[in-house]
């Protein structure tokens, strides 16, 4: 059933099950990501120099914004969608926090296996993935219950946090684990059409279950197609050539907006001051001038 937060025309469709217009919110970024950053001919990826290293500017602000604003704010986003303090809202809030916490922990666990360390940025990505994934089905979750991607210049890691999670949750809402018939009747009444596929097969109503899965897929496809068309129309007009991309602050002024280097890295004069690589580099703090000055003093 379309949520009250969705546009009016959504209510007149075949009633896919997103809570809080989650299909629109969660999936709009997918085609925009592909068009803006993907290697698909619209705008193109960033320059190689920009892709070599792009550390976060401020991890503490990222953590504060994600935890205090996004996670806590999502409580109101999902929990407020029913527009009432009722069973819908309470179940939604509980499911939202459970899914988000689980996704964060799983992401950190995988991070430790693959990279051998735990990362704050990875924790934030896992948290956002959980928030996105649970949103379409937040009030329907029963508690007991690539090579292609490597070519996408996903600067903000949107494809897996929004695209995969949003699509997966939208499909699973009508497919396997969600919408147990007795539980779904609390929200949708006794309409026999609204049943998850797994439960429909069990009850001998496979047709109704397949119909609901088809509706979920159609809703996802519509949102993606709409955004690909609209975003392409906007972005094709603003595409620029690689030489123009290089004409930013680094090329014109010989400096970056945020001159922050990590421990143990070196500041290559060639990169911003036009010197050759034979000039070598020197250990950097947040202030390259101060580092060089300290070196000169100790000499």
Swiss-Prot record:
<feature type="transmembrane region" description="Helical">
    <location>
        <begin position="59"/>
        <end position="79"/>
    </location>
</feature>
<dbReference type="InterPro" id="IPR001905">
    <property type="entry name" value="Ammonium_transpt"/>
</dbReference>
<dbReference type="InterPro" id="IPR029020">
    <property type="entry name" value="Ammonium/urea_transptr"/>
</dbReference>
<dbReference type="InterPro" id="IPR024041">
    <property type="entry name" value="NH4_transpt_AmtB-like_dom"/>
</dbReference>
<keyword id="KW-1133">Transmembrane helix</keyword>
<dbReference type="GO" id="GO:0016020">
    <property type="term" value="C:membrane"/>
</dbReference>
<feature type="transmembrane region" description="Helical">
    <location>
        <begin position="104"/>
        <end position="124"/>
    </location>
</feature>
<feature type="transmembrane region" description="Helical">
    <location>
        <begin position="16"/>
        <end position="36"/>
    </location>
</feature>
<keyword id="KW-0472">Membrane</keyword>
<protein>
    <recommendedName>
        <fullName>Putative ammonium transporter 4 member 1</fullName>
    </recommendedName>
</protein>
<dbReference type="Pfam" id="PF00909">
    <property type="entry name" value="Ammonium_transp"/>
</dbReference>
<comment type="similarity">
    <text>Belongs to the ammonia transporter channel (TC 1.A.11.2) family.</text>
</comment>
<keyword id="KW-0812">Transmembrane</keyword>
<dbReference type="GO" id="GO:0008519">
    <property type="term" value="F:ammonium channel activity"/>
</dbReference>
<feature type="transmembrane region" description="Helical">
    <location>
        <begin position="218"/>
        <end position="238"/>
    </location>
</feature>
<feature type="transmembrane region" description="Helical">
    <location>
        <begin position="158"/>
        <end position="178"/>
    </location>
</feature>
């Amino acid at each position: 059933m379309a949520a009250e937060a969705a546009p009016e025309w959504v209510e007149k469709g075949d009633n896919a099950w997103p809570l809080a217009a989650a299909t629109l919110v969660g999936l709009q970024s997918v085609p925009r990501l592909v068009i803006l950053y993907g290697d698909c001919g619209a705008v193109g990826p960033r320059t190689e120099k920009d892709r070599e290293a792009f550390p976060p500017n401020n991890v503490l602000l990222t953590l504060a914004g994600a935890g205090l604003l996004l996670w806590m704010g999502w409580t109101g986003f999902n929990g407020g969608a029913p527009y009432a303090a009722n069973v819908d809202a309470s179940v939604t809030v509980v499911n939202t926090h459970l899914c988000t916490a689980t996704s964060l922990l799983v992401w950190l666990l995988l991070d430790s296996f693959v990279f051998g360390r735990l990362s704050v940025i990875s924790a934030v990505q896992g948290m956002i993935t959980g928030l996105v994934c649970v949103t379409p089905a937040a009030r329907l979750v029963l508690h007991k219950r690539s090579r292609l991607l490597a070519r996408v210049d996903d600067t903000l890691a949107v494809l897996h946090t929004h695209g995969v999670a949003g699509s997966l949750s939208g499909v699973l809402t009508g497919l396997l684990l969600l919408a147990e018939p007795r539980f779904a009747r609390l929200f949708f009444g006794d309409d026999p059409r609204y049943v998850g596929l797994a439960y429909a097969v069990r009850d001998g109503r496979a047709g109704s279950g397949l119909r609901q899965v088809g509706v979920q897929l159609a809703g996802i496809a519509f949102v993606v197609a709409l955004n690909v068309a609209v975003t392409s129309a906007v972005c094709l007009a603003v595409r620029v050539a690689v030489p123009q991309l290089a004409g930013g602050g680094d090329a014109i002024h010989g400096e970056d907006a945020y001159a922050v280097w990590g421990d143990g890295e070196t500041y290559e004069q060639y990169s911003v001051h036009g010197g050759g690589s034979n000039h070598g580099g020197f250990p950097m703090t947040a202030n390259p001038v101060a580092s060089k000055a300290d070196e000169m003093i100790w000499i």
